[in-house]
Amino acid sequence: MIKLIATDVDGTLVEDGTCRINPEYFTVIQQLRELGIQVAAASGRQADSLLSLFEPVRDKMFFISNNGGVIGTSSRILFVANMDETLLQKLLEDCKAFPDCYLLLSAAEESYYLEGCPEDFVHLITEEYRFGAEPVKDWKSLPPIVKAAIYHDPALPHPARVLIEPWRGRLTGVVSGREWVDFIGPGVSKGRALREIMESLEVSAEEIMVFGDQMNDLPMMEQAKHSFTVGGAREEVKAAAAHVTAPMQEDGVLQVLKNLVKNKGEFT
């Protein structure tokens, strides 16, 4: 019997950068909880964006935010992995070489962007993602930072390789959706965060389902026997997944979850 479901959000349940979700997900999450199945949303987003997205069922879920940097529920934070301050400052210096990219730094409960960022970027993070983000004059005197997210125009060449390679072994750099490259502490990932939840609930790999579509979902998918990706996901993710559902636009994950409810939590 399945005891825990963990799912990515952007590109898996919703269009990247939006909070428009099929309300049937709320119904099926409620039904899963009635069957005793726990549900976790795992995302590069910060916690308040996830809480807003899942508002009707927020009190019934776990939330893995900031690509594994924070684990919590609607009422409390369970785990935080802050970045090393010295490494963070060096990363911020390196990012100055990319004038077409914009930074969003996330603490456990708040995010920050520089004053003067383009209005489109500010609208994206505050209105589309619904991040609780504050403008700051500089990066000084901020609370401990969990994640540095680098946004780039999806119409431009993806800077992931150039950004990530120099930091390999010192920070974890991951592609998070079409427009973001995220940096978190070494060893931090959705997979590590999911493992923390699995151990606390005493859930095995055979008792969990995981859904994802991007490279940052692979560590999480490795924790589960029943790993799924959606049609339209990256080919590397399809190759790693045990199953491929219908595309996100066709609510492929919802179809799987409905069948699981129909079968009383048994996956066949």
Regions inferred by a protein language model and the residue ranges of each:
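Short active-site oxyanion
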Residues: G36-A40, D59-M61, V146-K147, E206-E207, ...
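Conserved acidic, metal-coordinating active-site core of Asp-based
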Residues: D94, P99-F211, M215-Q223
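Active-site phosphate-binding/coordination module
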Residues: P23-F121
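Mg2+-dependent phosphoryl-transfer enzymes with acidic/Ser/Thr/Gly-rich catalytic loops
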Residues: M1-L4, N22, D182-T268
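Asp-based phosphoryl-transfer active-site loop
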Residues: K3-T18
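Short, acidic loop-to-helix structural element flanking the phosphoryl-transfer center
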Residues: T18-I37, V80-L87, Y129-G132, V188-E199, ...
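Short, structured coil segments at secondary-structure junctions
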Residues: P56-D59, N67, P166-G169, Q223-A224, ...
